[in-house]
Each structure stands twice: as C-alpha cells, then as structure tokens.
Amino acid sequence: MKVFYINPQSYNNLSTYDLSLLKNIQGHDVTYYHCDQYQHDILPGNSNKCYFHYNKKKYGITKGISYLCSIIRITIDAIIHKPDIVHVQWLRVWHIDYVFALLMHWMGIRLIFTAHNILPHVIKKNDKRHYKRYYKLVDNIIVHNSRTRKELAELMDISERKIKVIFHGVLNSDTAKADVISRADELRELLHIKPSDIVFSCLGVQKEYKGTSLVIDIWADNPELNANPNTHLLIVGRSHGIDYAPIIGFSNVYILDQMISDLDFDAYLHLSSAILLPYIRISQSGLLFSAVNQHIPVLVSDVGGLTEPLSYGNIGWNIGTPTKENLQRQMLELVRRPDEIEAIKNNSQEFDKVRKAYDWESIGEKTSSLYSGEY
C-alpha cells in the first residue's frame, strides 16, 4: 500500500513517536510529511517531506496561511501519486483539515486518523460538533486504549468497529546516557538537591488539563511539603494560564517557564523521584512513556488510559479521581515512606514488563495490518 503519513506536530515527544512507529511499519510504501521542528534522523526506506513551516510564523493569520499552503501541497501530491491511504496524526486547523479529509474521501483514498485525544485539551465551543463530523468521515480511528475506544464511540455516536486500539509505545530517547547523567548532576548541584532527597516533577507544557494547579494548591497549603528541606517540586516547561504565585516564595520549589532541550528534559526526568500526572482529562501521555524509559515512577490519575500501564507492571501509583485530596494523600505517603519510591525505581523487571507490553515492533505490526485491511 502507498501511504501518506501526515503529522504537522512532529516535534519533541511527537517526533519520537513518529520515528518509533515508522521504523516498525513493514510492507508499505510510506511518505512521511512532517514539520521543520522534526528532531531525529531522516528515516531510511521512507520518503520524507518537510512541508509544515507554520511554527516559524509569528502571527496567527500567517500561521494559518502557511498551514493551508502545506495542506495544498500534500493535496497536489495526492492527486499526482494517488496514495491508497492517508494517515493523519493530529488536526491543527479544523476547517482546513476537514476540507482536506473531504477531498481525500472524494478521491477514494482511505483515511485513517489517530485520536491521541478524543477532543482538544482546551475545548472550544464548537469542538465536539466539528470533531464528530471528522470522526464520522474517516474510515478508521486509532486510539491507544480500550477505555478511550468506548468513550469515543459513546460520545461521538460512532460504531466501535471503525475504532482500532493500538498502544502508544515507550518513548526511547536518543540522547547519550552519559550526557544525561552529567547534565542531571549539574542540575542537582545548581538546585541544591541531595541524592537522598525526594523530587516531585511536572515536566513539559503546563496547562490546566494536566492538573498542574492541583499540584500548586497542594504544595502551597501543606508545610510537610513546602517547608521540608529534603523534598522538592520541579515544574519545568512553558506554561499556559497557570498561576504560580502561591508557590513562588518556597525555597524547595523550582519553576522554569520555558521550552527546554531534549537533553535537559531527559536530565530533569533522570533526577526526579516521581513524575506527577494528575491529569484532569487525557487519552494517553507521552511523558508517562518517557518516564518508563528511564525507570522513573509515576503518580497517575484514573482518566483515559493512564492507569493501563500499571496493570502490566508496578511502576507507580494510581491516585484515582484527580482531586486535591487524592493526590495530596499519595504525595504525603511517599514523603513519609521514601523507601516505596526506591523499591519501584530499582525494580527494573517491572519496567521491563511495561516495555514489553508497549513494544514498538508489535505496534508497528498492528498498524501495518490495519493498512492492509487485516485488522
């Protein structure tokens, strides 16, 4: 099958996802359309086309025009090369993406969409109606867990038969381990973190749906956390609408409100005792699978597929519903019993079980089977 694989957001964890998946798709002629922030080596055996440049544009209207031009170029390629399948990873501008999907449908091209989330993280007025139209138009939808499959079918009134469950794999870093350890040691010294200290971390872009405000409220209100010299909170990554004022004055809190390099991301992950993932809503988290790669325990809320990896290996704690009380209870338990963190962190067999369950080879095989119409 000739496949156009399109990801306009192929940067950071999303570019690692693409690389890991495409390396394991066999028996198909894949053309990979990505953005200019793709961070990995060009994939051998595939055609690679850097068509998306909207990230470099300063204003919204110029970003939109740039994105439209990219989609027009892909449409022209589709007319010329006649792919059997178009596989879209993310939607950026709904009206443009929907018209593109209509054109592919009219051309008789099979359309597959990976729903990394059912709806955007920040939901606007017409999003549900728009996404419902898109979901009904496409031929197949990939989701990352059975729970999301059921939720999507019910919310959008579509048959579960067109929704296929294909896991999100463990995200392997291509940064040299020695460099990560060296940078983590530098950060540890800079932040005055002792090897025996407990470090809770929120990494990546910070938004309300990730539960960052829950973490802030808990730290601000609890002296067992905010006045403890052996416990630290790191919040690293660009924020959108997060109020850090309640925790600014605490000496054991470090906030870095900016994008960071892959090396620094891996280093902050490495020096963390536990990653906080009290998401309010999500289907699956790339950060969770980055933590698995480095054997860093996670605290996850029971939403989407976040708890599913814990069923394959004891790699962290399920806090249940993402409430202040539930998250605080678990954080305090770990502060009082740090041996629990070390027991999980040092049990490589449990992390290996999760890695095996979310193996990219089997994910690639399943995706290849879907392309062939066998799944």
Which residue stretches match the model-derived regions?
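Short N-terminal targeting/anchoring amphipathic segment
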Residues: 5-6, 63-66, 75-95
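N-terminal strand-loop element at the rim of the active site
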Residues: 7-69, 92-94, 148, 238-241
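Conserved donor-binding/catalytic core segment of Leloir-type glycosyltransferases
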Residues: 193-210, 216-219, 233
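Nucleotide-activated donor-binding/catalytic signature segment of Leloir-type glycosyltransferases, i.e.
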Residues: 243-267
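A charged, aromatic-enriched C-terminal amphipathic alpha-helix characteristic of glycosyltransferases
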Residues: 339-372
